[in-house]
Amino acid sequence: MAKKVTAYVKLQVAAGKANPSPPVGPALGQHGVNIMEFCKAFNAQTQGMEVGAPVPVIISVYSDRSFTFVMKTPPASFLLKKAAGITSGSGRPNTNKVGKVNRAQLEAIATTKLPDLTAADMDAAVRTIAGSARSMGLDVEGV
C-alpha cells in the first residue's frame, strides 16, 4: 500500500548550504521530519550546482514522517541577475534600465529553465525569459 502524503512543504534553499536553522528547520520540524537527514540529502544532490544559488524544493512529507523531495531549477531572476552582472533589478523597470542581456544569454538561461517551463519549444522559452528580464529592468537585445 502506498504511503499517505500528509503535507507538501515548498522552500527555497541555497544550494549546498541547507542547515537546520530557519527557514528549513521550523518548516520541516512542525511536520516531524528528520531535519538533518533532509539537509544531508539536499546538500548531496546540490553538490554539482553553484554554491549559494537559490534552489526551489518541494518536500512531500508522508504519514510515517519519511519524506521525498523534488528540486527545481534556480529562479529566472537569479540567473538573469548573474548573466547581467547586477545585484538587483530595477525599482522602476520601464524607466530605469539597470543592465543588458543578449539572445545568447537568454538561450543559455532558457536551456537551464526548460524542464520547469511550460513552453512548447526553445523559442517560446526564450521569449518567456526575455519577458522576465524586461520586468526586472533589463534591456533585451536580439529578441
Swiss-Prot record:
Gene3D superfamilies: Ribosomal protein L11, C-terminal domain, Ribosomal protein L11/L12, N-terminal domain. GO terms for cellular component: cytosolic large ribosomal subunit. The keyword rRNA-binding applies. One or more lysine residues are methylated. Pfam families: Ribosomal_L11, Ribosomal_L11_N. Belongs to the universal ribosomal protein uL11 family. This is Large ribosomal subunit protein uL11.
